[in-house]
Curated annotation (Swiss-Prot):
Its main location: mitochondrion. This is Cytochrome b. A ubiquinone binds at H201. The cytochrome bc1 complex contains 11 subunits: 3 respiratory subunits (MT-CYB, CYC1 and UQCRFS1), 2 core proteins (UQCRC1 and UQCRC2) and 6 low-molecular weight proteins (UQCRH/QCR6, UQCRB/QCR7, UQCRQ/QCR8, UQCR10/QCR9, UQCR11/QCR10 and a cleavage product of UQCRFS1). This cytochrome bc1 complex then forms a dimer. Heme b b566 binds at H97, H196. InterPro entries: Cyt_b/b6_C, Cyt_b/b6_C_sf, Cyt_b/b6_N, Cytb/b6-like_sf, Cytochrome_b, Cytochrome_b_C_euk/bac, Cytochrome_b_N_euk/bac, Di-haem_cyt_TM. It comes from Eliurus myoxinus.
Length: 380
């Protein structure tokens, strides 16, 4: 008799995705972050659902309702901080996941990669709208500044901004619709994740060597389920430590001040995971140019498969491009730091140099290094 997991219509799909999935035998811990992202998503939906039960999306009561959750709801403070810091964990895992894809040339599976970019944009939109909901000073002014960027679009910009706001400023209508979108988007993300996995399982996983691993595959369960459980335990340990010891470490103190349209905070800045893109936006004096650079800072990832010049897929055997890759990582950390600094000398010039370097490495230096390495290895 065939095992039920292999014959049942629903269990069969789960079996082919998580149990009998043929997986390269040599994938390292950098491949753990896909499953960690899944855990983060489940955690965010679960905690978010409980928060939504007590939250009110009205400008007069939103801030108070968050305070009420933390003070009066059983373990409300825990749910709230798990949700807020869970978002940070989500983005840490996302950045590592994308970074691993860049390092090992996983972007050569174009459908999976493009689906990942769409997912990245969707998660960023969800996180941005979630940041607006507590209706603190940084929530209000962050929403005002970021939505206002759309006014840079020629001809329809101003109309578009007022349409998104639901009025002439960020107000009750804006908060209500942001809450609605913030609630629905994670479920759309779940659907997109399924498509992402569908494309991934069409081609199979890449591996550190970048070579074809068809001749050396092992079942996903028990080998990688055990390996993933270790990753999940470490992630939860890190998250729970953050939540219980320093829950406000990654937040902004200004968000503990209720939103006041008459008083602008000294430094308007988004959450830490958007600072690199915010620094790129600020480094261009022109508004439309800044908005385009902001979008391109993520969209440039879609060009990676077309900019791949080397005959080797992975960077494992390419020391020149490896060096450029780690300079790019350092550059992104620099941009993250700059995004949180005031707009004054020397931060402006550092931000501009780091922004130019970011695009130069991806668009010029890495493709050139690939050709040079091929030449040196006599692979032409």
């Amino acid at each position: 008799m065939t095992n039920i997991r292999k014959s049942h219509p629903l269990l069969k799909i789960i079996n082919h995705s998580f149990i009998d999935l043929p997986t390269p035998s040599n994938i390292s811990s950098w491949w753990n972050f896909g499953s960690l992202l899944g855990i983060c998503l489940i955690l965010q939906i679960a905690t978010g659902l409980f928060l939504a039960m007590h939250y009110t999306s009205d400008t007069t009561t939103a801030f108070s309702s968050v305070t009420h959750i933390c003070r009066d709801v059983n373990y409300g403070w825990l749910i709230r901080y798990l949700h807020a810091n869970g978002a940070s964990m989500f983005f840490i895992c996302l950045f590592i996941h994308v970074g691993r894809g860049m390092y090992y040339g996983s972007y050569m599976s174009i459908e999976t990669w493009n689906m990942g970019i769409i997912l990245l944009f969707t998660v960023m939109a969800t996180a941005f709208m979630g940041y607006v909901l507590p209706w603190g000073q940084m929530s209000f002014w962050g929403a005002t500044v970021i939505t206002n960027l759309l006014s840079a679009i020629p001809y329809i910009g101003t109309t578009l901004v007022e349409w998104i706001w639901g009025g002439f400023s960020v107000d009750k209508a804006t908060l209500t619709r942001f809450f609605a979108f913030h609630f629905i988007l994670p479920f759309i993300i779940v659907a997109l994740v399924m498509v992402h996995l569908l494309f991934l399982h069409e081609t199979g996983s890449n591996n550190p060597s970048g070579l074809n691993s068809d001749a050396d595959k092992i079942p996903f369960h028990p080998y990688y389920t055990i390996k993933d459980i270790l990753g999940v335990l470490l992630l939860l340990l890190f998250l729970i430590s953050l939540v219980l010891f320093t829950p406000d470490l990654l937040g902004d103190p200004d968000n503990y001040i209720p939103a006041n349209p008459l008083n602008t905070p000294p430094h308007i800045k988004p959450e830490w995971y958007f600072l690199f893109a915010y620094a790129i936006l600020r480094s261009i004096p022109n508004k439309l140019g800044g908005v385009l650079a902001l979008i391109l800072s993520i969209l440039v990832l879609a060009l990676l498969p077309h900019l791949h010049t080397s005959k080797l897929q992975s960077l494992m055997f390419r020391p020149l491009t490896q060096t450029l890759y780690w300079i790019l990582v350092a550059d992104l950390l620099t941009l993250t730091w700059i995004g949180g600094q005031p707009v004054e000398y020397p931060f402006i010039i550092i931000g501009q140099l780091a922004s130019v370097l970011y695009f130069a490495i991806i668009l010029i230096f890495m493709p050139m290094a690939g050709m040079i390495e091929d030449n040196m290895l006599k692979m032409d």
